[in-house]
Amino acid sequence: QPNPNEFFGLM
């Protein structure tokens, strides 16, 4: 599962 940091990194 993708890490929260990865998700926010896209933003």
Curated annotation (Swiss-Prot):
Keywords: Amidation, Amphibian defense peptide, Neuropeptide, Pyrrolidone carboxylic acid, Secreted. The modification Pyrrolidone carboxylic acid is found at Q1. GO terms for biological process: defense response; neuropeptide signaling pathway; tachykinin receptor signaling pathway. Its main location: secreted. GO terms for cellular component: extracellular region. It is found in: Secreted. Expressed by the skin glands. The modification Methionine amide is found at M11. It comes from the Eukaryota. The keyword Oxidoreductase does not apply. Belongs to the tachykinin family. Tachykinins are active peptides which excite neurons, evoke behavioral responses, are potent vasodilators and secretagogues, and contract (directly or indirectly) many smooth muscles. This is Substance P-like peptide 2.
